[in-house]
């Protein structure tokens, strides 16, 4: 005998299967319209939610690209801050009174250091790296200032009395906090 079904057997097999249950009552046209309108409203809601999700995803991606562009140089800029500090120290090491007595070679060297420091600071600011304000008398802000000492000074209590190392920001982030001494007020 073969395993293949004969045409008569297929009809017998199909006869044993119950046909799908038909709804007991058929929908009226009005009920069908109401049901289809509800499905349409549900689908429209789903589409609106998907469009809102798509828009939010696009905005989030744009924001992440913008932040990546701004903060991509953060580590490199932080490494350059010590170069800026050293150039400033080199310039501060020579008092103004002694600058007049320099030889031509010394004046050229000093001019080169000044130009290098200026160009470095210009390049940093061009890329959004800016100094943190930390002048004596300014209000101490723990978000951008690091207090390394408290000293009596003519400045009001809680304000900056002295700047030890300049701070820098890139965008909204503090790249390096300014190291300052905070005033305790005038000495009694």
Swiss-Prot record:
Annotated localization: Cytoplasm
GO biological process assignments: protein folding
Top-rank taxon, per record: Bacteria
Annotated stretches, region: Disordered: 1-24
GO cellular component, one term: cytoplasm
Keyword Chloroplast assigned: no
UniProt similarity note: Belongs to the GrpE family.
Function text: Participates actively in the response to hyperosmotic and heat shock by preventing the aggregation of stress-denatured proteins, in association with DnaK and GrpE. It is the nucleotide exchange factor for DnaK and may function as a thermosensor. Unfolded proteins bind initially to DnaJ; upon interaction with the DnaJ-bound protein, DnaK hydrolyzes its bound ATP, resulting in the formation of a stable complex. GrpE releases ADP from DnaK; ATP binding to DnaK triggers the release of the substrate protein, thus completing the reaction cycle.
PANTHER family: GRPE PROTEIN (PTHR21237), GRPE PROTEIN HOMOLOG, MITOCHONDRIAL (PTHR21237:SF23)
Assembly behavior: Homodimer.
Protein name: Protein GrpE
Organism: Hyphomonas neptunium (strain ATCC 15444)
């Amino acid at each position: 005998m073969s395993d293949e079904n004969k045409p008569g057997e297929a009809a017998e097999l199909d006869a044993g299967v119950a046909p799908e249950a038909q709804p007991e009552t058929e929908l009226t046209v009005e009920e069908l319209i109401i049901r289809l309108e509800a499905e349409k409203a549900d689908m429209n809601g789903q589409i609106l939610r998907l469009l809102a999700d798509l828009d939010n995803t696009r905005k989030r991606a744009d924001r992440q690209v913008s932040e990546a562009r701004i903060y991509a140089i953060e580590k490199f800029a932080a490494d350059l801050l010590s170069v800026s500090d050293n150039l400033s120290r080199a310039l501060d090491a020579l008092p103004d009174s002694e600058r007049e007595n320099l030889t031509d070679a010394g004046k050229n060297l000093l001019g080169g250091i000044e130009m290098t420091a200026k160009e470095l600071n210009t390049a940093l600011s061009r890329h959004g790296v800016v100094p943190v304000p930390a002048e004596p008398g300014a209000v101490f802000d723990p978000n951008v200032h690091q207090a390394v000492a408290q000293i009596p000074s003519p400045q009001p209590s809680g304000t900056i009395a002295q700047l030890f190392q300049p701070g820098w920001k890139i965008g909204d982030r503090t790249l390096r906090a300014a190291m300052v001494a905070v005033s305790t007020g005038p000495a009694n």
